[in-house]
């Protein structure tokens, strides 16, 4: 009799424990659903909630990385200003539906609503109404995976979603980005930062096309010629400098400002170089930068004589040597620091050789 009572008591204790566990699980799931509902309702009432959640997403994603977190928050503020400017145009234009679509699609990811609205409005502004609000094909996979791993932990699920989105962006960013913007944003090692750079570049190019008309096409053809010419440089910084110099020469040629034969222009450039040699003795790289800055400030036209071409070729060769020497650095900041030290050391070596030659003569 006592033995049966003991077995029955254990059975009732087991049932009671199972009921408690079910109640806890239901409470956690309900709490997560309540948080998501509260987030969606708050953001629907006040568009400024998008900005707040976007900033919170930057904090979750980058944590102690102050530089990238500030860059992410700056993009949040930029998108918020654009949405405020577009607020007056929403009535009757159909663009107001972007927000409701994004709210439904990202009700459990409030930090993505602001970016989604910006992308939707850009597509609507370009006349492409049939494009989906979110082009990421792996969005549903990420959501299902993170819900299984972090059931009941809303904040943990947000971090999981961020990591999953970042991996998805890293896999398909090269397929979705226009070539000029992708080339311009290669310097960013972090996929999320590179994607934001590409989106900002796309916005600028769309604004140029809207306001500039044919000038944007002309700029694109000029950039294509310079891109082919500067493709030989493997280092990103050297290639960008080559592109800037090439495009500047193209603009000067198109504007009819080729004044290389004018003695006054030569005197202007020579004066800058002489001043910078005195100011930065022994540092050839600083002499070049100082001379370029001085020529821009003084308005000196770029020389097209053999000396200028030789200097540019010499600088390119030096940059190629330095880029090969520093290519083992994966971190962009360390690679740039290595490049600067290499150029500075190379400039001193060239000056020492020059002084030695003068002493021998």
Swiss-Prot record:
InterPro entries: Plant_Antimicrobial (IPR029227). Keywords: Antimicrobial, Disulfide bond, Fungicide, Plant defense, Secreted, Signal. It is found in: Secreted. Residues 296-361 are annotated as: Disordered. Residues 296-307, 328-341 have a biased composition (Basic and acidic residues). One of its GO terms (cellular component) is extracellular region. It comes from the Eukaryota. GO terms for biological process: defense response to fungus; killing of cells of another organism. Its main location: secreted. It holds the Pfam family Antimicrobial21. Residues 1-30 form the signal peptide. Disulfide bonds join 98-120, 102-116, 142-164, 146-160, 322-342, 326-338. Residues 308-318 have a biased composition (Acidic residues). This is Antimicrobial peptides. It comes from Echinochloa crus-galli.
